[in-house]
Amino acid sequence: MAKKKEKKAGKRMKKSEMSERLISLFHTKPNETFSLKQLSSSLNLTTHPLKMLCADIITEMIEDDFLQEVEKGHYKLNDHGLIMTGVFQRKSNGKNSFIPDDGGETIFIAERNSAHAMNNDKVKIALFAKRKNRNPEGEVIEILERANDTFVGTLKVEKFYAFLLTENRTLANDIFIPKDKLKGGKNGDKAVVKIVEWPEEAKNPIGQVIDILGKAGENTTEMHAILAEFGLPYVYPKNVETAAEKIPAEISEADYAEREDFRNVTTFTIDPKDAKDFDDALSIRLIKPGLWEVGVHIADVTHYVKEGGVIDKEAEKRATSVYLVDRTIPMLPERLCNFICSLRPDEEKLAFSVIFNMNEKGEVKDSRIVHTIIKSDRRFTYEEAQKVIETGEGDYKEEILELNKQAQILRKQRLAAGAIDFDRVEVKFEIDETGKPLSVYFKESKEANKLIEEFMLLANRTVAEKIGKVPKNKKAKVFPYRIHDLPDPDKLENLNWFINRFGYKIRTSGSKTEISKSINRLLDDIKNKKEQNLVETVSLRAMQKARYSTHNIGHYGLAFDYYTHFTSPIRRFPDMMVHRLLTRYLAGGRTVQEAKYEELCDHSSEMEQIAANAERASVKYKQVEFMGERLGMEFDGVISGVTEWGLYVELNENKCEGMIPMRDLGDDYYDFDEKNYCLTGRRHHKKFSLGDPVTIKVARANLEKKQLDFALIEK
């Protein structure tokens, strides 16, 4: 038996395999010294050729500075610079990578060397010896911190065990669930499962069900699954709702006495028709000929939500309301956001207000920030306010027309100062009571929307200037700002190169205003063109992301030196922070600890991005559901993405996006040209480029993966 084993090892042990086994051995025992004899024994090398091969590899490893010869014939890991910490990134194609904390070169991690690391895990790796003409490669030796241990999927229940089948492409294997950890889950249920262990020798992680969402395919189940997938809550904690129920809605005598009274000033709200949480209202009155007082009144949420209480802690954790296609997941309990704080018509409400004195040229002659009590006279939808603007008729027509005139002046001033006018089309769905999408339509931003937008921007900027704008010899107090950095020059160059194919160009150097004006010219030029949505999307990607920070750098996209978020405390936690600090500082209070508020700003920025991703996932789900009932139908579209695995096409009629897989382009073998965003056929030289118009047929709709497959229609 021994001879057979020896012969088998001698035949099958390749140099690459022996190298990896030696590397693994030295990394597993980095402080031990080995002789050749000990190495041969550890690796079960029993033939002379294998031992000689081992000696040759050891010599190479010394030359590569991977090993050191501590005394003649005894070797030890040369650990100088070879152990690194960073983030593991798992790819669905197996090309996993490691990004070092020090920002160095990305390192390839083969699947066999990943040690069950999952996407975005914080890990420690050992760097392999550098091989000629090979990219750096390493092995995960320790998982320091899991990025995520909870996954959403569909249960497949067998007699004695179950698996969670997940469409998460960055989880290499399905999750094994012992029968006693199913929590009543049945075959076909959507569930949330937590990984509890992953033994080194096991192919699958072991998990336990922590929540059953319902039957796969049901609307509420799928919407909750999207929330769970992004780590967002889909139920409100009972103790937080109980705390909200105890908050009195009545306004106290002290509040009446301490606040500026606007109850007899014409005041109204303008919101989407399906809105329930009205957190802003406008008031207007003529002070004297040519001078108007305009009030921007914001729900005084922090009067009711005390800092450090259970409601506040939950709001801080959530940081934002989440708007899925068919529902809102509020940051605050419903009693607060839809009842006590909501500026509903004909009800006395507490507000935090910015009051402007404005002349007919749209110039702010004076402003003040005060706590108020208001009473809204009318609740307008955007459509109702728009009708007043267009016809000049309707309730409060003089007030709305005056506000609209002022808003247009404010907007013109902003754009002249270099603000960028992104006006994206928003996809909306008409859905029935079961959540089924009946039609797709585009939400337009009209004058009524822009009226509200301009006064909210003005209030936000005024609040930021009040705290941030201080004399040069003074230091501004700590405050959360909404900041937006200048575009990256390389991204602008790439954008310019891309739009050249459509006959457009932008400035990539010069002053901030010159660059932003050239971008605005581009956005004007593409209006109502077939490439509009594509060019707008690529232009947006060239911009930096706006975020929250206590370190003010201004807001490039709005062309403001000072900007914050003050106007939506019902749905954004940063606005609650701003309200509290503004109240403190207006009363003469001292500054606060910067580190604490910077951390809250970072968390809020992160949660804002997660919420946006969840919202997009819900739109994508409904698009796939909608198109799934239109299999075989033909649509016109535009190529919105070109990859090595196929073409992405966005449909003109409804902005639904799907893919024409490379395998379905069967008339030729196509080469992917990454630089020029195109596929080119080898034999017939047919070319598919980004922005090309195409006609497709809906071939497949996979709700589980939120994917649409299209087939190209040749014309």
Which ranges hold each PLM region?
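Charge-lined substrate channels and their catalytic hotspots, especially those that engage the 3′ end
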Residues: 2-295, 302-348, 380, 384, ...
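Electropositive polyanion-binding surfaces
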Residues: 41, 192, 197-199, 225, ...
